[in-house]
Amino acid sequence: MSKTTIVLNQLQHLLPLREFEAFVGQHQADKYVKRLTCRNQLTILLYAQATGKDSLRDIQTSLTIRDSSWYHLGLETAARSTLAKANEKRPCQIYESLFYKMLEKCGTFSSGTASAFSFQNDLRAIDSTTIDLCLNLFPWARFRTQKGAIKLHTSFNVRSQIPDFIEITDGKVGDITAAKEFDLSQYPKGTIFVIDRGYTDYAFLKAIVAAGHHFVIRLRKNAQVLRLKAHRPPCGKGVLKDEKIGFVLPQALKDYPEDLRLVTYHDDEHDVTYEFITDEFRLSASNIALIYKQRWQIELFFKWIKQHLKIKTFLGTSKNSVLTQIWIAMIYFLLLAWTKFQTQFVGSLLELTRMIEEVLLEPISIIDLLNLTPRTVKRALARAGPPQLALL
């Protein structure tokens, strides 16, 4: 048998575990704990994310069947009630803090998306996604009269393709309300925020500019603006107009008294004309249109995590249990992104996810694994050692 530790253990050692233990100590979350520590809880819930486990029973079954693998992780079988209690009682803030500490580690890399830009500014997309919940099971998540929901308000780094801020609220919290709570000082000066027009709040846009950043957002259909003069002659495919404008209504003028730039752009592929407003006057109109197109990246991120992480079905019904599961899902996403970047894995993030799922409890080096293809993984498993179970 190879002396290489199992893949799950290798992934965990990519995490800032010393800081994690400090977070646990701050909350005294392991006080009086005899068996299932916070580290054990993290291990189990990462495993559940990687393998798509839907229930505590599924997890317990795996702990029982693969007991030798779990033993090498320092974990004995855990009763469902023990894990359920841990998810309900251990503060979810521990895992939220771990997410942001891991995010610091991921802050230096970028994806191939950056090559599409001819400018150096950091680019962030701001949006939210709603996760529906059954109100009878999750009464704390009241959204409408007969519907429950929570929202993930997110700032997404388009260059690195990872979220750099997430706020989880109940479904009633409006997008702009949550956005106004973002700490704009944490972003590098000159960051460009691309925002859906549902976030149109001129005081919020002014706050972005006051913090030393820029924004690109679609003009609302009912917005009343005064077209002052042409900013530049239309230049670039699809660019119809490039103008300087100002607001007309008193409240809009009060919230944003400065002039803005209006770029009118026609998308030939979908035969749709868009109007973008921005405070950025230096970039070309084509770049302004390209920036807004990148807003779609956050929609793809939301779609990906809903399809491939366990954030729509939950192992518990308490608020703390749900938030714990979501934060650990986000930690697992960062682990995948970090692994893909560091190993320069040429496949997609989904391919990486599927390969790791197949070998999560096997003693295979991650570096060796990512040099394989899905077809050759089985051969690698055969070389790694004998099967854990035999049918007699």
Name what the model sees in each region:
Residues 1-58, 62, 90, 97-101, ...:
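Single, function-defining residue in the core of a domain
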Residues 66, 70-72:
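Blade-loop segments of beta-propeller domains
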Residues 72-92:
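Major-groove recognition helix of helix-turn-helix-like DNA-binding domains
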Residues 141:
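A glycine- and small-aliphatic-rich helix-loop capping segment at beta-alpha/alpha-beta transitions
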